[in-house]
Amino acid sequence: PSAGQGPGGGGLPTYPPPQFGGCGVGGTYGTPSTFTSLLSFFGGSGGGGQNGYPGSTSVSGSSGGGGGGAILIASSTRITVAGAIQANGGRGGTASNLTVLTAGSGSGGAIRLVAPEIAGSGSLVARSEAIGCEAGSPGVIRLETSRGLFSGTTNPVASVSTTMSPVAPGS
């Protein structure tokens, strides 16, 4: 078993923990309505791995899910989203012979579209593949366009700017 891949991949807790409690909740990378730029964006963090029950040969550990990737699509004219663009975090593994002992899933990644016109009715998704206790945090989606004609869906809600920032690394 191992921690999930991506920046901030979690560690390997032991089982059983000293006490059982509620679920941990992943944090959010900023607030969609307050994003002013997404220049230095990264993929999502990996989920925490889970060790098996010490001394048991029937309960092995499981690995955390990988974090979602970072996708940048830029055009000097137009981007049309007709299908699905996804940067989802992977689901954490489940310990053998158990259904309740699950490693953490990776958080969603980042999607950034930059063009004078963004259109289409497709979907943009940057979320964790899991729900409930083992879910990772949502990712981020940013649309930078002077003419937004995109009528599709985003999960999580995208931040939108009419100012197109530089797309070159380090700029």
Language-model features: locations:
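Glycine-centric low-complexity/flexibility signal
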Residues: 1-112, 116-121, 126-139
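Extracellular/surface-exposed low-complexity segments
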Residues: 137-171
